[in-house]
């Protein structure tokens, strides 16, 4: 199974680019973040023409996640459990069927800036809820992938200029500790297991020529349960997408 995650930064604004990548890369399963549309405005038919089943958890203007699979999806969940008042569309989960089913979770973790505000508190609370939910799923002992835009820079090797991010929520000790807490449940960072080379970024800001100067960060991750990690054969970052016309500021993993 080839599984991809991509923060597309508005699926409708970049639909031509997104579809071109799907036609070329042809992942079996993909989770998308920041689709920035309600369910009814998601271009479902365009993906169905490429052979995908579609599940969407959208929101007007902001956030929004989707899951696309060449095989049917079962047990679909929209929204992260643990806070019924949370209306932000950041979580989607499904079991992708087939001879070797996989539970796939797509997340768009809160940015959290500025630190010291309710936005940072929400980020940490969201990560704690994710941790608790994953702990409930792990006893199922099934292949599980938690992929998406984590908005966390795990290690110094994952940022070109660490000093520029010291005051940012993505690089705070609390954010990084919460990411490690997920790993400490027994989850494997797919990129670190398959490659691990420094300087492999998934995001370059639109500002100040970040792409041209390779001033990037690695914040898009896939964490694998033991059963999924046993099946890991490789990881690739499609950094060439950042140079395409009208690109997202993220690239597919």
Question: Language-model segments: which ranges?
Answer:
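Structured beta-strand-rich core segments of catalytic domains in phosphoester-bond hydrolases
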Residues: 35-38, 42-114
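Surface-exposed cleft-lining segments at the edges of enzyme active sites
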Residues: 81-82, 109-127, 163-168
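Active-site beta-strand/loop signature of hydrolases that rely on acidic residues for catalysis
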Residues: 6-7, 22-40, 104, 133-156, ...
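Short, acidic/polar
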Residues: 12-24
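Active-site environment of divalent metal-dependent phosphoester hydrolases
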Residues: 11-13, 37-41, 115, 153-154, ...
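Short amphipathic alpha-helices and their capping/turn segments at secondary-structure boundaries
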Residues: 20-22, 90-99, 129-142
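Metal-dependent phosphoester-hydrolase catalytic domains
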Residues: 24, 41, 76-83, 156-253
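Active-site-proximal beta-strand elements of phosphoester/diester hydrolases
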Residues: 1-10, 101-116, 147, 250
């Amino acid at each position: 199974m080839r599984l991809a995650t991509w923060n597309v930064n508005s699926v409708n604004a970049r639909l031509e680019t997104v579809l071109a990548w799907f036609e070329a890369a042809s992942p079996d399963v993909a989770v998308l973040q920041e689709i920035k549309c309600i369910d009814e405005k998601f271009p479902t038919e365009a993906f169905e023409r490429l052979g995908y089943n579609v599940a969407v958890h959208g929101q007007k203007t902001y956030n929004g996640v989707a899951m696309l699979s060449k095989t049917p999806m079962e047990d679909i969940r929209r929204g992260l459990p643990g806070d019924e008042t949370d209306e932000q569309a950041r979580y989607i989960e499904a079991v992708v069927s087939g001879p070797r089913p996989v539970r796939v979770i797509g997340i768009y973790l809160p940015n959290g800036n500025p630190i010291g505000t309710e936005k940072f508190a929400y980020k940490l609370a969201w990560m704690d809820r994710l941790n608790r939910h994953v702990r409930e799923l792990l006893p199922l002992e099934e292949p599980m992938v938690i992929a998406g835009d984590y908005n966390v820079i795990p290690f110094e090797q994952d940022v070109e200029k660490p000093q520029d991010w010291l005051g940012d929520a993505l690089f705070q000790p609390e954010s990084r500790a919460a990411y490690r807490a997920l790993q400490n449940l027994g989850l494997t960072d797919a990129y670190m297991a398959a490659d691990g080379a420094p300087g492999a970024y998934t995001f370059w800001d639109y500002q100040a020529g970040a792409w041209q100067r390779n001033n990037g960060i690695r914040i898009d991750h896939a964490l694998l349960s033991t059963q999924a990690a046993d099946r890991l054969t490789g990881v690739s970052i499609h950094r060439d997408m950042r140079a395409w016309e009208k690109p997202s500021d993220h690239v597919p993993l």
